[in-house]
Amino acid sequence: MAQFIDRRLNGKNKSTVNRQRFLRRYKEQIKESVADAVNRRSITNTESGEDVSIPTRDIKEPMFHQGKGGVRERVHPGNDQFIRGDKIDRPKGGQGSGGSGEGEASADGEGSDDFVFQISKDEYLDILFEDLALPNLKKNQVNKITEWKTHRAGFQTSGVPSNISVVRSLQQSLARRTAMTAGKRRLMSELEEELERIQRSEPPQIMEEMRIKQEIEELRNKIDSVPFIDTFDLRFKNYEKRPIPSSQAVMFCLMDVSGSMDQATKDIAKRFYVLLYLFLTRTYENVEVVFIRHHTQAKEVNEHDFFYSQETGGTIVSSALKLMHEIIEARYPLGEWNIYGAQASDGDNWADDSPRCKELLSNKLLPYCQYYAYIEITRRSHQTLWHEYEKLQASFDNFAMKNIRSVEDIFPVFRELFQKENA
């Protein structure tokens, strides 16, 4: 009786390889769906995956079929109503069967639902932050950020077909066949020598000769039954991620919490910073984040207070920039750290303070920052703070300004600010 041995190493996830191939094949469609999902779901919800939909037309496989037109005769099974030459009336109500669903009629006679499937939390975040990086990251004296690079690392017994090593697999096949047939070949060689001796002997030993020939035939069949290649022989090129020397960095997050920032504007700012925080903590293992909230006064706070504190007041933006400069001087030596800043505000500021903000940025922050991004969240026309900051763009390539008008603008703006230079 035949015995089947399951040597698959994926365990319960026997379709893992197929799933990974599918995600690579429809990468662009999945990225578009994930970008749309960012605006639909709570940005703080990272404990679950996401339902991704792909239009059915994008996943259709190419196929050979008969073209339209021409004269053809077909035999349809089960026909007991028509004979050759009969004409069949068009069904009433259009091309498709009548439906009772609600909604407006369509000009097209047929269609299909999108293909919907679930991606995991890790897959969701990997796709979300793909092709993003901190701009202008440079190596400094002390390296703490752990970045990874893929290297060849020998062979493994499982993997995707594209990584299969033909030479190593054939070597394993030869070794297995040699080990499994060596004893049988040795015994068959001995029997052949015995058969040759018996055939030369007198008188002839017919029965003994037939017995030996039968044993030789059985051994030959057993040797031939050993498969040339088996799944056990397959070897795949193995790749592993190894840490590479990089640089340590600190990101300053400055958020305006003054009275002019209504709840909707604050929510957009928090969503942007949560997205930034997830990106930094997932992409860079040891990057530090400094949270600063400000109204008339600026204060360094922890992560929880930054996102959930209800404190508010007037508006003096320069207080946050001044505090950022003080923290840099006290804790982050310029020769050892890559310094980044991200500032979010609705643009309202005390008129006399806006020139002061421009001066602080141009003299004390931008010359030492790798990158500084200013996000203004407003649907109104820009005020003095925006116009003062605009003067800095001509002088500093490491300074970027973007306007967010609604929740839908958050992710596109975020990608523009942190797109990889070579992506």
Swiss-Prot record:
Location of the region described as Disordered in the Swiss-Prot/TrEMBL record: 62-112
Compositionally biased tracts (Basic and acidic residues): 70-92
Pfam (any one): DUF444
Domain of life where this protein originates: Bacteria
Comp. bias intervals (Gly residues): 93-102
UniProt similarity note: Belongs to the UPF0229 family.
Protein name: UPF0229 protein VC_1873
Lineage, top ranks: Bacteria, Pseudomonadati, Pseudomonadota, Gammaproteobacteria, Vibrionales
